[in-house]
Amino acid sequence: MPPYTVVYFPVRGRCAALRMLLADQGQSWKEEVVTVETWQEGSLKASCLYGQLPKFQDGDLTLYQSNTILRHLGRTLGLYGKDQQEAALVDMVNDGVEDLRCKYISLIYTNYEAGKDDYVKALPGQLKPFETLLSQNQGGKTFIVGDQISFADYNLLDLLLIHEVLAPGCLDAFPLLSAYVGRLSARPKLKAFLASPEYVNLPINGNGKQ
């Protein structure tokens, strides 16, 4: 039986990054898919620590909060930088990803029709810090921090992929980010996962907007 279990809705959502991480690292995991009907029934929601998913099980350890799960996997699988300085930078990147993801989620679920144009106009300013970070790390030719992949890379990759769907061409003005997406997406195990039905057939969000 796989050591990991992901309990989540049938969407990519906040689990896409951790699934990419597990697939790329050659880890197996079990999916427990929660339908809207099951969630609305209420008992599962009541059992969740914060009343929300994802829920993640690593043996007898149960975790909630998607970024906590990513950090846990970062620590246990060696994806948290090579020293404390790199770990701090990885945290900084991941917090920046979370800031933009929250804005994206707010747009998708509360203000898509009225707010999309303004969101897309402001997007270059939101993406620029990540281009800057890449430029400061070995000329942008490796990862977002250091010379080995971290959990923040998977989270940033997912963030960039969903924004390419929302605003095609949004990375055209950011050559390092554009190359970064291509480079990470071409990693053999990750490439296979991104082409798999388990990824392709899942909607990005739960309301059909993207």
UniProtKB/Swiss-Prot annotation:
Biological processes per GO annotation: animal organ regeneration; cellular response to cell-matrix adhesion; cellular response to epidermal growth factor stimulus; cellular response to glucocorticoid stimulus; cellular response to insulin stimulus; cellular response to lipopolysaccharide; central nervous system development; common myeloid progenitor cell proliferation
Modified residues (Phosphotyrosine): 4, 199
A GO term for molecular function: S-nitrosoglutathione binding
InterPro entries reported in the protein's UniProt record: Glutathione-S-Trfase_C-like, Glutathione-S-Trfase_C_sf, Glutathione_S-Trfase, Glutathione_S-Trfase_N, GST_C, GST_pi, GST_superfamily, Thioredoxin-like_sf
Secretion signal span: none
Subcellular location: Cytoplasm; Mitochondrion; Nucleus
EC number of this enzyme: 2.5.1.18
Entry's Gene Ontology cellular component terms: cytoplasm; cytosol; extracellular exosome; extracellular region; extracellular space; ficolin-1-rich granule lumen; mitochondrion; nucleus
Reactions catalysed according to its record: RX + glutathione = an S-substituted glutathione + a halide anion + H(+); prostaglandin J2 + glutathione = prostaglandin J2-S-(R)-glutathione; prostaglandin J2 + glutathione = prostaglandin J2-S-(S)-glutathione; prostaglandin A2 + glutathione = prostaglandin A2-S-(S)-glutathione
UniProt-recorded name of the protein: Glutathione S-transferase P
Organism: Homo sapiens
Designated gene of the protein: GSTP1
